[in-house]
UniProtKB/Swiss-Prot annotation:
Positions of region (Disordered): 390-512
Keyword field: Phosphoprotein
Taxonomic path: Eukaryota, Metazoa, Chordata, Craniata, Vertebrata
Descriptive protein name: RIPOR family member 3
Entry's family note: Belongs to the RIPOR family.
Gene giving rise to this polypeptide: RIPOR3
Biased composition (Polar residues): 478-495
Phosphoserine modifications at: S9, S24, S340, S351, S384
């Protein structure tokens, strides 16, 4: 069932259009067909690279909802994994035996090169066997802990069922509550162990082998294959050619296996402007944990008229481990590596012609280093700068012309070449596989338009960066973590003063962004992916994460002597300590000094260092708004959240996404030199009254944020002449209330006070002004002071007179503050009968004020989840008068409260909502009755606990 396949490189898909449709219903146009024929002959290294999926361990994340553990599924995957690991270990042991036997039979030649390389390969396999044995022991330990927790959970569940059949008593209820907590803890432990076990499942490399059909596959047909494994997806498109061959846009994809997800495959036939679903099938991943690559044929249709051929290859370790350790199932098989090693001839000393060619290649590099200009791309860049460049700079220079190889023979002859370097230039980027896969991932899942700003491509050489934030991610919105998007790095080599300033910034105490970024992403993953606000926020945060760099990561410059020394010592292969992958890639002829170890992947570097944007102002802004996003997402994950509160939270999430999008297009070199906010954000000039206040809080170089205490003092200084005389003693309180509203997103988030280290950004302040529709800040502050005074009056004598004024124009002037709504609601319980009637009547009359009602509903719905029983009771009564049917589910849930007063208020409010309220109350009453019946069943059962 062989199928002739052609795969298009990512660079060719733009011209080919992958499987694009023409304007007519005829499918491909003739021009597109001609472009396909031209692009087939191109061979891109990147198309041969596996597109590595982003790691999405579905259970090992904070803030996600703990699902019910599935021990049988975990047992099945564990047994398959253990079987595959043992098989893998046997293969490694057989390889070691073969190398040991060959080591004994090898005679030492004059150069000793082959003998030493064979010895290195033997030690490498031994290290890999030890690593595999540790891997197996770790998996066994995790599963043993999982089984213990499973038995504890089963025992607690049995005891809970037994106690449920006991006569109802206080002791039985307490025991049931304790058992419920134990059950929850055991389930959480099992869930965490499942997440830890998923990390050890390795990777599946799935390669497309083509569609097989009989009468169904016709020339010109377009097909789309979609594969899903949990949250990971791979969509590829193909076309049936006239010679019965098939053209597909991708060849291989790496998936991270999970414990509870299987591989779903869906095939769709593209017809003109429509599509027809051919079939869908699900494959059990437990069958994929085998050492050797296996070709599977999947029946897409029920009758088997169309089959899909796939090659599945399992790697017990991830790609990063694969790059630094041997693996028989890697991109280069063990057989090919043995062939390249055993048939290898020790290289001779470089000839005069080769040394001359090296010196010619080195001259422009030396000049570029001395002059500080951009360097020409050559293979020497990979040899000399592999540990000096950032990963993004390496990825920019991966596409090398074939003439840059300084091999004097055919580069394809990698096994018998005796030149200075026997490795093909096209294979060099394979050493940097993770970065290439990240770029392919960015191409595979492009961001929707408008989420991230359009990045202008860099002009000139790969190092000729323009200052500013807009050009720092020039190639793609999703770049590797080494992408330097701070403005000082590119220009620091040309201006000593700027270099010193940048160095001072980076060496000083900064803001750590790695933790907040990961926390926000972990909170975003378990959320509802159908919400566009959350999806767009995730894309925006991912864009920032991929462009952050490790702290103090600077470009180092080497002299001409060190560059020459690096080149000459690349032939010191006898002293090199190479991993097997690098040895096979370079043919054993390239080496590094022992004191110049191979640089680790960028992902390992980034993980061991804190990430920074390179500009202190940007770090502060990102930190503040990431903390706001974290608080919003935590509240979104709360149980029994009302739809009203959820919509308000999603609106604020969209606002934070807009702020991050604005930050991504700012020129932060300009920010560092700005003296006023209008220079950075011209739209800020529309709020002239607020700008004067903000200018008093900021200074040159830091115009987008200020400490909360500074803004507090500036507010006092600005408004003291209007407030002190008319409202004595209210200035401090009014200023603090305003800042609390700014920080808590208008009362949406719980207030955490105003510590001195709290930072307030311009975007938070401007968002507050927009939310309150402030055109005159002085007038707004006066109304806020009146409301603060009103709160005090509601706690003093003469409350009835004050409450009666809460109507009409006076009601419309209120924000209202959370303190106002709280005091108003509590008057229904704590006041005199006359005051209670007045407070209830004014709340009922406030229904006509739409703005007030929305804010009041939001506050009182949040109050239902508080631990204050008096506030819960008052909130229920307030929702009754406001006709808050939007919160009917939250109100009905309080009908099961332990306190009679809260239950009565919740029952009264729920039944006041008409037919919907009656149905909700009956539903809750039915649940209560079922629970009571469970307690009363089999009352004669006696339980003895030792």
């Amino acid at each position: 069932m062989s199928v002739r396949l052609r795969f298009l490189s990512p660079g060719d898909t733009g011209a080919v259009g992958v499987v694009g449709r023409s304007a007519s219903f005829a499918g491909f146009s003739s021009a597109q067909s001609r472009r396909i024929a031209k692009s087939i002959n191109r061979n891109s290294v990147r198309s041969r690279m596996p597109a590595k999926s982003s790691k999405m361990y579905g259970t090992l994340r904070k803030g996600s909802v703990c699902a019910d553990p599935k021990p049988q599924q975990v047992k099945k995957i564990f047994e398959a994994l253990k079987r595959g690991l043992k098989e893998y270990l046997c293969v490694q042991q057989a390889e070691l035996d073969h190398l040991s036997g060959r080591h004994k039979d090898t005679r030492r030649n004059s150069r000793l090169a082959f003998y030493y390389d064979l010895d290195k390969q033997t030690r490498c396999v031994e290290r890999h066997i030890r690593k595999m044995e540790f891997h197996i022991s770790k998996v066994d330990e995790l599963y043993e802990d999982y089984c213990i927790q499973c038995r504890l959970r089963d025992g607690a569940s049995s005891m809970q069922r037994a106690f449920a059949r006991c006569p109802p008593s206080r002791a039985a209820r307490e025991s049931l509550q304790e058992l419920g907590r134990s059950l929850h803890e055991c389930a959480e432990d099992m869930w965490l162990i499942e997440g830890a076990l998923e990390v050890h499942l390795g990777e599946f490399h799935i390669r497309m082998k083509g569609l097989v059909g009989y009468a169904r596959l016709c020339p010109g047909d377009h097909y789309e294959v979609l594969m899903r494994l949990g949250r990971q997806r791979w969509k590829l498109k193909g076309r049936i050619e006239s010679d019965d061959s098939q053209t597909w846009d991708e060849e291989e994809k790496a998936f991270i296996p999970t414990l509870h997800e299987n591989l779903d495959i869906k095939v769709t036939e593209l017809r003109g402007l429509g599509s027809l679903a051919v079939g869908a099938v699900t494959c059990d991943i437990a069958d994929f944990f085998t050492t050797r690559p296996q070709v599977i044929v999947v029946d897409i249709t029920e009758l088997g008229t169309i089959k899909l051929q796939l090659e599945v290859q399992w790697n017990p370790f991830d790609t990063e481990s694969f790059l630094v350790s041997p693996s028989p199932t890697g991109k280069f098989s063990m057989g090919s590596r043995k062939g390249s090693l055993y048939n290898w001839t020790p290289p001779s000393t470089p000839s005069f012609r080769e040394r001359y060619y090296l010196s010619v290649l080195q001259q422009p590099t030396q000049q570029a280093l001395l002059l500080g200009g951009p360097r020409a791309t050559s293979i020497l860049s990979y040899l000399s700068d592999s540990d000096l460049r950032g990963p993004s700079l390496r990825s920019q220079s991966q596409e090398l012309p074939e003439m840059d190889s300084f091999s004097s023979e055919d580069p394809r002859d990698t096994e018998t070449s005796t030149s200075a370097s026997t490795s093909d230039v096209g294979f060099l980027p394979l050493t940097f596989g993770p970065h290439a896969s990240i770029e392919e991932e960015a191409r595979e899942d492009p961001l929707p338009p408008g989420l991230l700003p359009e990045m202008a491509h860099l002009s000139g050489g790969p190092f000729a960066e323009q200052p500013g934030w807009r050009n720092l991610g020039g190639e793609s919105p999703s770049l590797p973590q080494g992408s330097l998007f701070h403005s000082g790095t590119a220009s620091s080599s040309q201006n000593g003063h700027e270099e010193g300033a940048t160095g001072d910034r980076e060496d000083g105490p900064g803001v750590a962004l790695e933790g907040p970024l990961q926390e926000v992403l972990e909170l975003l993953r378990p959320t509802d992916s159908t919400q566009p606000q959350l999806r767009e926020l995730e894309y925006q945060v991912l864009g920032f994460r991929d462009r952050l760099k490790p702290c103090r990561a600077r470009q180092e410059h080497t002299s001409a002597e060190s560059l020459m020394e690096c080149i000459l010592e690349s032939f010191a292969f006898l002293n090199a300590d190479f991993a097997l992958d690098e040895l096979s890639l370079f043919g054993g002829s390239q080496g590094l000094r022992k004191d110049r170890p191979l640089p680790p992947p960028s992902s390992l570097k980034a993980s061991s260092r804190e990430l920074t944007a390179g500009a202190p102002e940007l770090d502060v802004l990102l930190m503040v708004h990431l903390q706001v996003c974290k608080a919003l997402l935590q509240k979104l994950a709360s149980p029994n959240l009302s739809r009203l509160v959820q919509e308000c939270l999603l609106e604020e999430v969209a606002q934070q996404k807009h702020v991050l999008e604005t930050l991504s297009v700012l020129d932060f070199e300009k920010v560092g030199k700005a003296t006023s906010i209008e220079e950075i954000i011209p739209q800020a000039s529309r709020t002239k009254g607020c700008l004067k206040l903000w200018r008093g809080c900021t200074g040159p170089g830091r115009v987008l944020s200020c400490p909360a205490t500074t803004l507090l003092n500036q507010l006092k200084k600005t408004f003291q002449h209007r407030v002190r005389g008319k409202y004595p003693g209210q200035l401090e309180i009014a200023c603090r209330r305003l800042l609390e509203q700014v920080v808590s997103c208008g009362g949406l988030l719980p207030g955490a006070g105003l510590p001195e280290e709290q930072i307030i950004t311009w975007f938070q302040f401007h968002s507050y002004l927009q939310r309150q529709s402030v055109s005159d800040l002085e007038k707004h502050f006066t109304q806020l002071t009146k409301e603060v005074t009103l709160i005090e009056e509601l706690h003093c004598a003469g409350q009835a007179k004050v409450v009666r004024k809460l109507q009409g124009k006076r009601l419309g002037q209120l924000q209202p503050l959370p303190q106002t709504l709280r005091a108003w609601a509590l008057l229904q319980l704590d006041g005199t009968p006359r005051v209670c009637r007045a407070a209830s009547a004014r709340l009922a009359g406030a229904v006509r004020n739409r703005s007030f009602r929305e804010k009041a509903l939001l506050f009182y719905t949040n109050a239902l989840a508080e631990n204050d029983a008096r506030l819960q009771q008052a909130a229920c009564l307030a929702l009754k008068h406001l006709k808050g049917i939007e919160s009917i589910d939250q109100t009905a849930s309080l009908c099961q409260s332990d306190l009679e007063a809260v239950r009565a208020a919740a029952r009264e409010t729920t039944l006041s909502f008409g037919e919907k309220g009656r149905l909700a109350f009956e539903k809750m009453d039915k649940l209560c009755s079922e629970q009571r019946e469970v307690f009363c069943q089999e009352a004669d059962v006696e339980i003895t606990i030792f």
